[in-house]
Amino acid sequence: MAIFHKKPKEREHPEQLTPWERFQRDAAENHRAAQKSHHSWSGKRLRIGDKLPKLKSQRRRLLFKRVVILMGCFLIGAGVAGYFISPLSHVQTVTVHGNDQLSVTQVKTATKINPGVALWSVIGHDQRTTKRAERAQPQIGKVTTKLVGLNSVRVTVKEIRIAGYLSTGQHYRRILENGLILKVTYSQPGGGSPIYANFKSGHRLATMIAQYAKLPSAVKHNISEIKFAPNKANPERVHLYMNDGNEVYATISTFASKMAYYPGIVAKMKTKGVINLEVGAYSYPFKNQNN
């Protein structure tokens, strides 16, 4: 006779479970929760792992960029240093332009621009070079420099024109059109510029030079001597001896404006004579001179 054991019915409510059944149920739930947490953490680790190659690639690019910058700075610094110690950074040849009264050697000496000097001390320092040149050679008014090729320098000077030579007895001193009287004395005056004689007043001489500077070049070159010759009627009278053989009487304060008529007056004269520009403008032959 078979004996059948009847399966006990599952309890429908938790409060009907025995302590052992409740323990087994809690253990099973804890196991399932642990497995779920493990799978979730593994997924996160996989996602972070996917990002690691990208981070490494970014770091490599950043490192490469820094290395390139450092190498670039080093190469630039080395190139600059190499240039400054190489012959390319020094003046190789010097050419001088614009000089008329001054020689090339005088300009080079005054500016101190000679082969061998550093280019960086010359190019871009025209104002400083001009001041240095003026102290050494007052006849230099302005200096400009230009780099030609790799290391050749073109020096252009603007001279202050010579207004003439001041007679000081047995010697002569050069006068510039800016009124400066140079200290150097000469036994003979230079050609192409007038001699200033009998000028005792510095103010009179300065005014005369300023008036002379306004004249056209053709008239300037025709004046041989300017002699201060005042009289009672005209304390500013000057007596000029011209290279063409004529003589002129004029007034210092109106000298430039009156001398502008000189070429036209001479063209109408039939013989050499005297031209008086003190009051009005008229001329007469030497035989009728009465001064």
Curated annotation (Swiss-Prot):
Localization per Swiss-Prot or TrEMBL: Cell membrane
Transmembrane segments: 67-87
Pfam family, one: FtsQ_DivIB_C
PROSITE patterns: POTRA
Organism: Lactiplantibacillus plantarum (strain ATCC BAA-793 / NCIMB 8826 / WCFS1)
Keywords annotated in UniProt: Cell cycle, Cell division, Cell membrane, Membrane, Transmembrane, Transmembrane helix
Gene assigned in the entry: divIB
Extracellular side: 88-291
Record-stated family: Belongs to the FtsQ/DivIB family. DivIB subfamily.
Cytoplasmic face residues: 1-66
Protein name: Cell division protein DivIB
Primary subcellular site in the record, as a coarse category: membrane
GO biological process: FtsZ-dependent cytokinesis
Keyword flag Protein biosynthesis: no
Membrane topology: Single-pass type II membrane protein
InterPro entries: Cell_div_FtsQ/DivIB_C, DivIB, FtsQ_DivIB, POTRA
Domain POTRA per the UniProt entry, residue ranges: 89-160
Annotated function: Cell division protein that may be involved in stabilizing or promoting the assembly of the division complex.
HAMAP family associated with the record: DivIB (MF_00912)
Cellular component GO terms held in the UniProt record: cell division site; plasma membrane
